[in-house]
Amino acid sequence: MIEGHGDDSYKYSRPITANFSSNVYSRVDLSALKAHLCTRIDGIGNYPEPEPYTLEACLARHHHLPAEAVCVTNGATEAIYLTAQTFRGTNTAIVQPTFSEYADACRMHGHRVTSLYRFPAESEGYRLPEEVRMLWLCNPNNPTGTVVEKEYLATLISHNPQVCFVIDQSYEFFTLRPLFSAAEAAEFPNVLLLHSMTKRYAVPGLRPVSYTHLTLPTK
């Protein structure tokens, strides 16, 4: 995880009046969650499940997916770095401007990274550059808030079967525009969809709170 991410209140001893360094939604009533955690506090005396299979199975049932298609991670950040590591050395395009962690993770794992500032049009056959094998898209985007229309994105994915699309929907609860559901994304064999509970529920310190679902092979 890169330095300078923000929300680093642990560095300061004085009270913080206003925090503009993070886009976590702060007006969430966490009283029920805190009460639940208090009832489970005795669990700190035991090791947790080595792999979060129980939670993954629960999320899979919720999204009507096979359990092996869901991967729970320590925030979306871990999912980003694990994805970059799994596909190390890939020719990667990142839709810009966007969250800098995608490029950091990819460069750490030897990706050949290029920036993409516009999407191909119908007149171009919706084709991405020939050398691209992985595309990262934050949708809705951080920091611009723009949303790529679901219909266009589906067309783009269909016309580029050689590309693995990593779509980060961490901000999906901050828009009324239609986005891919897990079931819709699962119809494509080349999509990896990232979800995060951090932003909506304001729990960045509670891990794991993010999960990924995928339908593509990893070899």
Located regions from the model:
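Phosphate-binding glycine-rich loop
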Residues: 55-91
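Conserved small/polar residues in nucleotide/adenosyl-binding loops
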Residues: 212-218
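N-terminal "arm"/small-domain region of PLP-dependent enzymes with the aminotransferase-like
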Residues: 1-47, 131
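Short glycine-rich anion-binding loops that position phosphate/pyrophosphate groups of nucleotides
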Residues: 23-25, 76, 139-143, 172, ...
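Hydrophobic/aromatic beta-strand patches that form the interior of the parallel beta-sheet core
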Residues: 18-20, 93, 114, 166, ...
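Active-site pre-lysine segment of PLP-dependent enzymes
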Residues: 121-131, 143-203
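PLP-dependent aminotransferase-like
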Residues: 85-139, 143
